[in-house]
Structures are given as structure tokens and as C-alpha cells.
Amino acid sequence: MPGASDPVSPDPTRKDRDGSPSPGLREPDTGLRIDVFSLFPRLVDDFCSESLLGKARGQGLLDLRCHDIREQTTDVHRTVDDAPFGGGAGMVMRAQPIFEAVEVADPPRPLLLLGPGGRRFDQALAAELAAGDGFSLLCGRYEGVDHRVRQHLVDGEVSVGDVVLSGGEVAACLVIEAVTRLREGAMGNAASTVTESFGESGLLEEPQYTRPAEFRGWEVPDV
């Protein structure tokens, strides 16, 4: 498995399998395929059904497939976690349902685990992923995933910052939006991705104003 600092490069030779889009969305022709594996797939699917991402899905530019890891459990209680060997606080996500969820979906690679120890997600990595045909995200929960998932299943780990979240779903939404808006046709104005913060210059965007020219005594500077 690549280390946390290794480049994350989508496989351009990977061929997608047929899948079912979310209700109300047409089947994309050449859209960017992103598969998300989560215990709460609706969190991601609902967020990505609104605004720019919802439009991209409707236009066939984004083929988002959210998979419920719990569907691959084998017991009546649909157990996805267990106590860690050696003791300690919290629970660990079991390897079996994660492996089987991925194997059933046959998702595009790389498959990236969202976690605090991975490569820092930034605009450069977003552009790298946007240049490929697709990738997949694994959302952890609780105290994380069984380490064998890191060793034998995922291709790398990505971190959205030095913060603690309850799960990877919010981070997944961040990654999906940052990548999708870099795809051709996703933005209403193609120049937006060039002139905005972290665009071609790599710098922050200049201050922006709109009407009225004077508000509560504060005036827009001369252009």
C-alpha cells in the first residue's frame, strides 16, 4: 500500500461497471465516477444532491455512487464494529463488511481512506483526482478501521486537516465538491477555477464587492 506521502494517482485504464444512479438522476455518459463507502451513505448522497453537485449529477458530469457498508454484514444485528484487541476506549470498524462492500461494488481506484494520518488534501490533490476517470472514498467511524483495511485494501489515506470528526462523511463531501468543480462543464463560468483562490497563481483571490456602491457609509474602492 502506498505511504501517506505517496502521490495518489487515478488509474486511467480502470473500466467502470454499470451501476444505478440516485433516483431522479440520469445515467452519466462520461461523468467522473466517485464511489463512497460509508455507514451513513445518505449523509453524502443528500449533500451531493444540492447546488453545484446536484446539477453536475443531473447533467451527467458526476457519477456518484454511495454504498452502505452495513449491507455486507453477516449477522442478524448487522454488526459493523467490535472492541479492539488489547482493550481501550471506543470500537473499531470490522474488516469483513468493508472488504466485501468494496469487492461487490468493484469501484474505481484509487480507493482512499479518509483519516487524520494521510496526505493532506489540498487544491493540487483535487486537481490530480479531477484529471482522472474516477476514484473512491472510504469513510471511517468510531475509533477507525481495522488496520488490515489500511494494509490490504485501500490505496492511500487522505486527511482534510488536523481536526477530529465523528466520521469521514463530512470530509468526503469536501473532497467531492473540490474535485467536481474542477471538471470541465461543472462551473457556470470556466474562468472561475482559474481566477479564484488557489487557482493558477496559487494565491488567495482579491476582495470582492457588489451593489450598492455605498453601504452604511462604507464605499467600494475605486477600480
Residue ranges of each PLM-predicted region?
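N-terminal nucleotide/polyanion-binding subdomain common to many enzyme families
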Residues: 1-105
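Short, solvent-exposed amphipathic alpha-helical segments in soluble enzyme
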Residues: 51-56, 127-131, 152-153
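Short clusters of hydrophobic/aromatic residues that line enzyme substrate/ligand-binding pockets
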Residues: 80, 85, 121, 129, ...
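Structured adenosyl-cofactor binding patch, chiefly the S-adenosyl-L-methionine
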Residues: 145, 149-198
